[in-house]
Amino acid sequence: MNTSISSQPPCIRIFDTTLRDGEQSPGCSMPAQQKLVMARALDALGVDIIETGFPASSQSDYEAMTLIARELRRPTLAVLSRCLQADIETSARALESATKPRLHVFLSTSPLHREHKLRMSKEQVLESVHKHVSLSRTLIDDVEFSAEDATRTEEDFLIEVTRVAIAAGATTINLPDTVGFSTPEEIRNMFTRVIANVEGANKVIFSAHCHDDLGLAVANSLAAIEGGARQIECTINGIGERAGNCALEELTMVLKVRNAFYNIDTSIHTSRIVSTSQLLQRLVGMPVQRNKAVVGANAFAHESGIHQHGMLRHRGTYEIMRPQEVGWVCSHMVLGRHSGRAAVEQRLRALGYLLEEEDLKLVFEEFKQLCEKQRLVTDVDLQVLMQDTTVQHGYRLASMTISDVGNRANALVELSDPQGQRVAETAQGNGPVDALFGALAAATGVKLELDSYQVHSVGIGADARGEANLSVRHNDTQYEGTGTSKDIIEASALAWLEVANRLLRNPENMQNKQNTALA
């Protein structure tokens, strides 16, 4: 592939917005401590830029940025801001502790947005871009400007907006496909023409931020690279507003597997992709579909007899990449009652969990208790421990009893509250799960409205467990929860408690939190 700008770096910058745009996916809200856990994993993955949130819209995002900035030194840390002086100043304060700060400002540019959202003329948009990018540069040296809804903006006006932003000091220009409307050819042509017609284009990095409303986010991001983009904005598992964003794992593996065609690299340590994906699934309670490219459970599964025969002869017949390249590896280390803390920590790191000393101590105590109940501890068991400890500080399930009462079910649950006190409640329902959720609601005081509920098996043979996935609503906001146990009713209780604890840990979630969407 011939790139449009030979002077640009041969390595694509990966801008991960899982903690900002990804979190805007319904049910994927994360409190500050969970964002820190995820940011550590993104750092270990090799992400170049981590967008941590929108500090002006949320105190939790402000706190998350502060926590992350104190710890992470390698990646650039970005925060989003509207073109408003107060937003920009708040964002700059949130970035004060960052070693490599970036201020990311955006403004809509399309005629539809100008007329109905901004109620601004072209001249007013240009004036605002110049004013607020200039202000941002007085506070932070690294400034990214995003022309929201760029792909539906008149080409001549988009060129003018880009010129003004560069003249005002922007170091990165992002041209988003905000509603996932464009096709690869249109995206490629847009980048090619804007770069060719804007003075100073060779002095900045052009970025693409593509949404997946028509399933083209990854294809459009690749087309943007062909048109000259040298930064791609993406998320783990493709989570994000509406249908999501460009999936980091898919984009990076395309560039790796088809490197002879694209001749462009990334800084991503691909062997950490699966563990990072699984960590996110646990944190937000949103599993990926089994046939999801790269990270789905079936991504390297072969059932057809013809395919299996070919694989036995040569793996290359039906596999274009090795499972180990993205982190699909089996542990050869057996964990049990004689395993030490170092062995447990090493396995947790391989699974994508980077723990503070206090959290590791808590997990190891739970590990030793589990070893009293079963001879061996699997990766699935460790992930359940993580869900029960570092993720679920709050109410813990102590015991439960389900019984039939005529045509109804009765549930008795006993919980340990955040202070360690025991709380017991009972409830009746139309079935065991309905009764269980009623008892949990009575015990915690959290009311959740169930939208969907699924149970499936994870693991193989004697190690198999039931995983419960539920989607619930609280104050008209959707949340996802996941629980895993050898008992599916217990797994359901853990999934329910995961959501309840998340709500109780973050008071903002107990209200209607407004997310401001970009691009």
UniProtKB/Swiss-Prot annotation:
UniProt pathway annotation: Amino-acid biosynthesis; L-leucine biosynthesis; L-leucine from 3-methyl-2-oxobutanoate: step 1/4
Q: Which amino acids does the record list as binding Mn(2+)? A: 21, 209, 211, 245
- Primary localization: cytoplasm
Q: Which GO terms describe its cellular component?
A: cytosol
Spell out the residue ranges making up region: Regulatory domain: 396-519
Q: Which cofactor does it need?
A: Mn(2+)
Pyruvate carboxyltransferase domain mapped to chain residues: 12-274
Q: Which GO terms describe its molecular function?
A: 2-isopropylmalate synthase activity; acetyl-CoA C-acetyltransferase activity; manganese ion binding
Compartments in which it is found: Cytoplasm
Which reactions is this enzyme annotated as catalysing? Answer: 3-methyl-2-oxobutanoate + acetyl-CoA + H2O = (2S)-2-isopropylmalate + CoA + H(+)
Q: Return the EC number.
A: 2.3.3.13
Give the record's keywords alphabetically.
Amino-acid biosynthesis, Branched-chain amino acid biosynthesis, Cytoplasm, Leucine biosynthesis, Manganese, Metal-binding, Transferase
Pfam family example for this protein? HCS_D2
Under SUPFAM superfamilies, the record lists: 2-isopropylmalate synthase LeuA, allosteric (dimerisation) domain, Aldolase
GO terms under biological process: L-leucine biosynthetic process
Task: State its role.
Answer: Catalyzes the condensation of the acetyl group of acetyl-CoA with 3-methyl-2-oxobutanoate (2-ketoisovalerate) to form 3-carboxy-3-hydroxy-4-methylpentanoate (2-isopropylmalate).
User: What PANTHER family does this protein's entry cite?
Assistant: 2-ISOPROPYLMALATE SYNTHASE 1, CHLOROPLASTIC-RELATED, HOMOCITRATE SYNTHASE-RELATED
Family membership, please give it.
Belongs to the alpha-IPM synthase/homocitrate synthase family. LeuA type 1 subfamily.
Q: How does it assemble?
A: Homodimer.
User: Under what name is this protein listed?
Assistant: 2-isopropylmalate synthase
Q: Which organism is it from?
A: Xylella fastidiosa (strain Temecula1 / ATCC 700964)
- Gene name of the record: leuA
